[in-house]
Amino acid sequence: MIDQWDGSCYRRTLVIRERPLEVSVRQLPGPASPVLGVELRGSSATLADEDVAEARRVLELTLGLGVDLGGFYRLADGDERLRNLARRFSGMRPPCFPTVFEAVVNAIACQQLSLAVGIHLLNRLAEHHAPTRSGGGWPPAFPTPERLAETDPQDLRELGFSRAKSHAVILLARQVATGEVDLEALRDEPDDRALATLVALSGVGRWSAEYTLLRGLGRHHVLPGDDVGAQNNLRRLFGLDQGAGYDAVADLAQAWWPYGGLVYFHLLLDALATAGDVIIAAFAAAESPSVASEVAGGVRRTAS
């Protein structure tokens, strides 16, 4: 699996400066304010300071460590249903994919599929097309654009991708690898321009584009209005009319501005917990955890 969690340790292999870097993250015991201990492992004898700095940046992005939840909790206090949801998952931070490319590929892969099937498909993609093989049981890194650009569509078909999705993923990989499309530049673009760029890509419609704004660009005000799962959850918890679609979801999201995306994540967690796919433990305090460990620089470094 790309992301691994054993109940106390989160593990993932990141591609940092074109090299795999294996990351493990734990919440350290002791202080009242949450502190995360991070261990990095690379293939070279030493890790450069630039590697550590980039790994820190990516972890802060992917784990949502810089997100201030105070405004969301104040909003939730004004609505009993939202308040109960927020309290149930107090301290939950919005995750983000390490790269916009990974977010778009996730969106394409998960179109018209259940979350479980989509995740299975993406894990198979990583297992067969990771840019490098990690040792010691570490997770496979998500494939780079350069790696997927060299892949034949039939290879993805054999993993379970549809013909259209296979072509869309490989075309996107080639566009990014050659510089024809710069997805990371979308981080500096306003929503409307980012959406226009995304929907112009093969295989990307409104849902995929809005999903990418939320999961790839960290636009936490965006609630993907075409998301069928979100619509079902809104009906279950907020009384959204049966048959109500994008416009009705957009109206609700406007009332929650600028936290529609945070509501989306809480609804997803609630649905997973209700289905027994997530075990609710003692969630972290609402304040931001800091990235630290026992050594100077905030990260323990090892070489494999």
Task: Walk through the language-model features, giving the residues of each.
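HhH-family (HhH-GPD) DNA N-glycosylase catalytic core used in base-excision repair
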Residues: 1-304
